[in-house]
Amino acid sequence: MKQNRKNLPIILASSSPARIELLNRIKIIPSQIIPADIDETPNLRELPAPLAIRLAYEKAIKIASQIEESAIIIAANTVAAVGRRILPKATTYEEVKNCIKMLSGRRHRIYTGLCIIKKENDQLTVRQKIVQTIVKFKKLSDEEINFYCSLDEGIDKAGGCKISGYAEAFISFISGSYSNVMGLPLFETVNALTSLGFRCSSIMPAKMNYCHSAT
């Protein structure tokens, strides 16, 4: 009689509250959260999509090289861009303001590079995906821009805005995955996990029990 194998433990290579929340939405609770400390500086003339997938891979492979146990590592990197121009992860009030001014009344793209590595018996199996979402902000007044900047929610966010926060009120158009904008495209994440043999019955609508990865 064939026995069902236990899921490998999930390691999330990020301390992002949004990514943790998104995994919880699909009833997946990581066994460990290990942020990957890498240099996220774009290479010369590097475009947004290649940057996002490169950084996601570097995060995942770094954690895979650090652990000894078998596990599935989930890593992601989100990049906001207007055309080919990569917007920074804003770290100051002025950077947030500059980003919001640039996004006002324009379409921009959110790219999330997803890399999931299954490490088992020192063998690595890699799944990678780049997901793009198009977002358009309404034309913002100076008052709206200044108010948003005063909230500080755009600090440390790609493009200087938190789409799941107050900035959601600025969106006049969105095309593509909303969870991608938040930092982890759930459809692609579930597909990649499934292809690596990770089973979670709670992903199915009829099942509501949480699926903890094995410890």
Curated annotation (Swiss-Prot):
A single MF term (Gene Ontology): nucleoside triphosphate diphosphatase activity
Organism from which the protein derives: Rickettsia conorii (strain ATCC VR-613 / Malish 7)
UniProt name for this protein: Nucleoside triphosphate pyrophosphatase
Main function: Nucleoside triphosphate pyrophosphatase. May have a dual role in cell division arrest and in preventing the incorporation of modified nucleotides into cellular nucleic acids.
Pfam families in alphabetical order: Maf
Key words of the record: Cytoplasm, Hydrolase, Nucleotide metabolism
GO CC, any one term: cytoplasm
Family: Belongs to the Maf family.
Subcellular location: Cytoplasm
Major enzyme class: hydrolase
CDD domains the UniProt entry points to: Maf
EC number: 3.6.1.9
Stored NCBIfam families: maf (TIGR00172)
Gene Ontology biological-process annotations: nucleotide metabolic process
Cofactor(s) essential for the protein: a divalent metal cation
Catalytic activity: a ribonucleoside 5'-triphosphate + H2O = a ribonucleoside 5'-phosphate + diphosphate + H(+); a 2'-deoxyribonucleoside 5'-triphosphate + H2O = a 2'-deoxyribonucleoside 5'-phosphate + diphosphate + H(+)
Keyword Nuclease: no
